[in-house]
Swiss-Prot record:
Belongs to the enolase family. This is Enolase. Keywords: Cytoplasm, Glycolysis, Lyase, Magnesium, Metal-binding, Secreted. (2R)-2-phosphoglycerate binds at residues 164, 338, 367-368, 389. Its cofactor is Mg(2+). One of its GO terms (molecular function) is phosphopyruvate hydratase activity.
Amino acid sequence: MYIEIIDIYAREVLDSRGNPTVEVEVMLEDGSVGRAIVPSGASTGKFEALELRDKDSKRYGGKGVLKAIENVNEKIAPKLLGLNAYEQVSIDKTLLEIDGTENKSNIGANAILGVSMAVSRAVANSLQLPLYKYLGGVNAKVLPVPLMNVINGGAHADNNLDIQEFMIVPAGAPSFREALRYGAETFHALKRILKEAGHVTAVGDEGGFAPNLQNNEEAIQVLIRAIEKAGYVPGKDIYIALDVAASEFYNGETGKYFIDGTEKTSDELIEYYESLINKYPIISIEDPFDQEDWDSYRKFNEKVGKKVQIVGDDLYVTNVKRLEKGIELKATNSILIKLNQIGSVTETLNAIELAKTNNMTNVISHRSGETEDTFIADLAVATNAGQIKTGSLSRSERIAKYNQLLRIEEELGDAAEYKGIKAFYSIDR
């Protein structure tokens, strides 16, 4: 099969935070067009592929992406025009060769990813296939369990909570549609509880609330109350997940973590997590330690890895080399997948495949600076990942992904599978 790329064009658009980002359009010889917009993170791992920004203080506070746009239009396009769009692996390889650096710092991961995603979409449109079916083939059928970030802290909020995300996980629902309902009803119950307690209910970057509470544990207790108020059973219908983002409160000089107003060693932090796990229906903990604290990950996984999903985000940055190290050390039993951490569709699919082969779960994820692009919804179904993180139950750039998943579930009909608790296959539940 052969279809030529005849045009590639990039432009500067805005993300959900009002910051510039890259949008790319790819046209094929039959007139099919694929468009993709690249997201952007707030708490970024130090090993992520480089997002190229202009650093021109006169435009967008230095956050413009005109250099990345120019790289697409003037460096990438001439090399890709005339190539066969069906050969995604070869195209992504060419993109990496054009850049020539380990972390994509030459032409920018945002430039490369925009093109990589747009090529996938263009081909799916040309074949008149849904994107999930083009990427995943006939076996793409698993709707993901959503990990819904309804209370924000850390780098995502201006409040006193250290943990970055407190999530509800409707793993007890019978279908994705019902899971979304469980989540939405709990979100509204949570809003009422916070309002009655005199907290501000404005939402943060990912659509969650950012109240000032006594400590991190109180946030979990409030979530439990919201689940019950919505008429659900914590630990049966809906579970709790945390994204600690511990690199954000780790002191590299002392080797200690500052959480809940005190400094803790990594062993004390493990004890703290264990006490929470024993008290509350916590099913998943992401980034519990600093991105270079491999030893603490290994210890923690050895202790609780049979009963709680331990997710590496900043630890792995969707990078196969770092994931291989994690597998060797038995550092975690799960990986967070973010397209823009690594910067191409092929490399993302390689990371997902490697994790699955080693009985690790994959959690497909958005970024805090999102857009209306729904690529990750299709990616989750394409890879049968079984889990997705795409924010709270408010803000259109988050809801866009949930709505796309509803459409996919409807389209799949009886073939659609919602694994629920079985999506957490790396733990004993």
